[in-house]
Regions:
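Conserved residues at the C-terminal ends of beta-strands
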Residues: 212
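Active-site-proximal, substrate-binding regions of enzyme catalytic domains
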Residues: 1-204, 215-277
Length: 277
C-alpha cells in the first residue's frame, strides 16, 4: 500500500527527549556527581484522543519496516519540516523505516526562485504576523495557480522547453482544475498547502494520505460528499487509528516508553532492537 506521510506525522514520531538523570550520592575526593544522560517521554498531549493517534505511529512504523506499507514524502512536505525542531532519535516510531521521494504535482522552482528561507515558508497567518516576506511562499504560489485558466495553461505549455516541465508536470497542468476545486472546497487559503499535498498524492497514485489533523479528514469527507471533482485516482485521507483499522489492526502496539520514567542512555541499547535503530 502506497502511503504519503504528512509533515505532522514525522513531527510527532519522536517520543523522547534527552535529560540529565536524577542525582544520586556524590563520591570521590572532588565530591563528584553520578548523574547520567538518558531519556524521558515527552509531555503527553492534553487531548487524549489526539495522543492516542500519536501513539499509533509506533504501529505504523512497524508496518513500514515489515514492508506492508510503502511510505512516501516529497519536497513541499520537506520544506514544512524546516520549521520543526529536530528531536531525539531514541524511541523514534519511524526509526529504521524506509521512505521514498515522489515528485510534486508541480515543481515551484520551475516558476519562481530566490532566497531559500523565503522559498520554504508556508506564507500563512503566522508568517504575515511576523512581518515576513511571503512572495515566494507555498501559499502565494498556490494562490497564483488558482487564478490560471485554460488560456494561461496553454501559454505555459508553449514555454515547456524553457521551463523544463516533465511529462508528469504537463499532466498536472492539464489536471489543474482538480487542484483549484480542492482549494475552493477547503474554504481558506491556509488550507491550500494541504490541498496541494492531497493533489500531489492523487497524481502519484497514493492509496492513503496519512495525517494527524482532524480538520483535513473533515475537508476530505466534504470533498467526497460534494462529488463535483473529477479525480483521476482516489487517495483517501486518514488518521493513524482509522488507517490501522483499514489494515485490520484492531489494537495498536504498546508505546515502548512510559511517562514519568527515566531511561539511562546506556540501558537504552539493551532495549528491543527495533526501537531507536
Amino acid at each position: 500500500m502506497r502511503v504519503m506521510l504528512d509533515n505532522g506525522i514525522f513531527g510527532h514520531s519522536q517520543f523522547a527527549e534527552s535529560v540529565l538523570g536524577p542525582q544520586g550520592p556524590r563520591f570521590g575526593i572532588h565530591d563528584q556527581d553520578n548523574q547520567v544522560w538518558g531519556f524521558v517521554r515527552k509531555t503527553l498531549d492534553p487531548d487524549r484522543e489526539y495522543q492516542s493517534q500519536i501513539d499509533a505511529l509506533f504501529t505504523v512504523g512497524r508496518l513500514i519496516r515489515e514492508k506492508r506499507i510503502e511510505a512516501f514524502t516529497y519536497c513541499e512536505l520537506m520544506f514544512e519540516s524546516f520549521n520543526r525542531v529536530i528531536g531525539e532519535t531514541a524511541f523514534d516510531a519511524f526509526a529504521g523505516c524506509a521512505r521514498s521521494d515522489c515528485p510534486p504535482a508541480l515543481m515551484r522552482s520551475r516558476f519562481r526562485g530566490g532566497d531559500g528561507f523565503a522559498f520554504a515558508r508556508k506564507g500563512g497567518k503566522k508568517d504575515r504576523k511576523r512581518g515576513l516576506d511571503t512572495g515566494l511562499s507555498q501559499i502565494d504560489f498556490m494562490e497564483w495557480l488558482c487564478t490560471l485558466d485554460d488560456r494561461h495553461i496553454a501559454a505555459i505549455l508553449e514555454c515547456n522547453a524553457i521551463l523544463g516541465l516533465t511529462e508528469f508536470e504537463i499532466g498536472s497542468l492539464r489536471n489543474l482544475s482538480c487542484f483549484q476545486r480542492l482549494c475552493a472546497i477547503s474554504q481558506s487559503q491556509e488550507n491550500y498547502p494541504d490541498m496541494f499535498h492531497l493533489w500531489t498524492a492523487q497524481r502519484n497514485r497514493m492509496d492513503v494520505f496519512l495525517t494527524l489533523e482532524k480538520k483535513l479528514t473533515q475537508i476530505f469527507k466534504h470533498i467526497e460528499h460534494a462529488r463535483i471533482i473529477e479525480i483521476e485516482h482516489q487517495t483517501t485521507v486518514l488518521r493513524p487509528l482509522e488507517f490501522l483499522r483499514l489494515l485490520g489492526v484492531a489494537e495498536p502496539d504498546p508505546v515502548p516508553i512510559e511517562p514519568g520514567r527515566f531511561y539511562p542512555a546506556h540501558e537504552f541499547m539493551k532495549l528491543p532492537q527495533w526501537v531507536g535503530k
